[in-house]
Amino acid sequence: MTYDHNLASAGVVRAAPPPLVAISILNWDGWQDTLECLESVRRLDYPNYLTVVVDNGSCDNSAERIKAWAHANLGAAHVLADYTQEIALQGGDPRSEEALQRTASLARLVLIRAKENLGFTGGNNLSISYALRRAFAPDYVFLLNNDACLEADCLTQLVDADRQADAAMIGASLSRLGVRRVENRSESGKTRVPNAASTREEFNGFIKEGGRRPPDLENRQISESLKKPSARLDADDDLIPVAWASGGALLLRRDLLEGVKQIQGDYLDDRFFVYGDEAALSLAASKLGHKPMLAKRAIGYHRGMTSTGGHWGALQFYYSTRNTFYGADYLPKFERLRFRLVYPLKSTGRILKYLLKGRPSSARAAFWGMIDAYRGVTGKWRDHDREAELGRRGFLETSRAEVS
């Protein structure tokens, strides 16, 4: 509780305002999901938040549709700050920031237009950089997938959990969209947290196959490196430790973000682009002494993988194969060395399995993921097979000549 010095002498105590939370939502050619997510945010009962939407280089006029929604739904006194990437990285426009600060949470929105698709890592790094460089920097950043919807008290539960347990990194309890909870349990009476976080045994690092969790040796190594007891998802505790927390609905305290940036140069490891980055962030947080936690009472619903068509394809197999290699950098030295020895064998086995199952596109993606890992290729996926085809036709050389 803080004091107003002008009132303190009169014996009047003024309660501190609730911590400010910047809600970071990424949009990439998915304005329908984003608008549904924004409607969910408007129903939150938490009183002090700033919604930040990063349009990640969309080609479907998403930014204009989001602006139109804001003008139609946020009320006559709303404030919409429409920033370029450059202005956002400066902490926004001072006059707009003042107006945002004076406006109620329900009636303020920041739209940042990225020059290109920066991925999950780059888009959120842009949003976090803007938020923490504002004159009115938030106490927390809440990463929220644009295909997620929240119960009204979700953000309140997350902030309260951190203030009670000093956790710094807390994931919401997410069910697949369409599976509603009843008093934190599904209709069958069993707790459902399939998309929220992972226990030590379930932690699979960065590789999933069609929603399954294969028994990968290298991922067990990542899990075991945490040296934490297993979390029981049916435990009575409202807040439970997990090996990693999903970025689908993840509350991050400012001091944690600043500490991670000091270690690795940015808030999220931008080598990943997408997939596996939140697991790496969880490992980085653990090194700083912060245990990733799951707040069972902070409930949300997540459709999942809408930006990639709703199912696992070549993109996912490429990123999961490549990013597993980079994720090993967060392991202790001995386990990292052991991982490097196992990685090519496991990756080659996975490629052969896809070929035997008649999935050549998945095999090619996993192959290039492994090759690019050793070549140090980071960021957005490059379709090497397509580039080779264009090169054979002479198109690639022509385009390069035109650029130069």
Residue ranges and their predicted role:
Residues M1-R43, P94-R102:
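N-proximal low-complexity "stem/linker" segments adjacent to membrane-targeting elements
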Residues D4, S24, L283, K287-W368, ...:
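Active-site-adjacent helix/loop segment of glycosyltransferases
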Residues E39-N48, A72:
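Short, acidic, metal-binding catalytic loop of nucleotide-sugar glycosyltransferases
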Residues E86-E98, L106, R113-R134:
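Glycine-rich, basic loop-to-helix element that forms the pyrophosphate-binding segment
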Residues F136-C149:
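Short beta-strand-to-loop acidic/aromatic patch adjacent to the donor-nucleotide binding site
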Residues A148-K208:
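Conserved donor NDP-sugar-binding/catalytic core segment of glycosyltransferases
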Residues V193, T199-V242, D255:
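Short, flexible, basic/aromatic active-site loop/helix in glycosyltransferases
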Residues A243-K261, D266-I299:
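A short, conserved alpha-helix in the catalytic core of glycosyltransferases
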